[in-house]
Amino acid sequence: DRDNYPMFWGLPCIRAFHSIVPASIMEFYPEIGVTRDVASRPERSCKAIRYLFSVRYYFDEVTPDNLEPEGIDLPGFSYYDTQNGFHIYKNDYALPMGFTFDTYVSRSQWETYSESDRCNLLLRALVLEDDAVETYQKDMQKLPDAVHQMSDEDLLAECTERAKTACDSFTYNSKGFHATISTDHENLVFFSVPWEEGWSAEVNGEPVAIEKADIGFMAVPVAAGDSEITFTYHTPGLKAGALLSLGGLVLFAGYLTVAGIYNKRHPNPKTESICCVDYSTEETAN
């Protein structure tokens, strides 16, 4: 019953009771052992997604057994304040939206790891679909099979590395989002925004392909140097549907016009208009 508090507070949150979400979200969560039916409720044991999704604060409800802040089992989170019945912890390793990786893992290789290993691995390597590996393997190193397990110290070290190549700015509106980044070589910039067919992207004003990364999210290629990245979303079929609806209205208006002209030129014969009748029930004598 507390899933949607952040919606009232005006804060984006990875926890929500919401059944209308992109299909890629439904694909992603089961891959790391998280049930996703009508709500997103990742447990704290799945630590890496708090950093991957750029979570900055964690709200821990005050209960009779938790009257004083005693810390939480998320590395890098420190006590910040207590407000509105919640102990608030701040992520001192919070990542900006948009960052790069030097290492990748193919989707088929990813499937060989356990669900518990997969979650933390998301901070160490970018998961690429098998058909995208050939295109981007020249810019990134393949993850060695022996380094897929991570400790809390490893997790924070990877956060530090991701922060070094993060976007300088990130803004969003109702149509999409815009980011800037500086890189020293060609790479993919990852955004923890769910992948959908309605997205299009430009880098420095030129259209680029959007790659599906980390099972259900997006990444775009950038060249070395400064890059301005713009993502724009258009609901698939919305424009075509609007045009078809407009065309239908035009045809209907044309039909009414033609029918009106025809009726004026070919009026129906006038008939007597009868309002009502009456009759007698009395028998007529012979």
Question: Where are the language model's segments positioned?
Answer:
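Conserved luminal/periplasmic juxtamembrane motif of membrane-embedded glycan-processing enzymes
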Residues: 1-165, 173-178, 190, 271-279
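Active-site-proximal, structured, solvent-exposed surfaces of multi-pass membrane proteins
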Residues: 130-279, 283
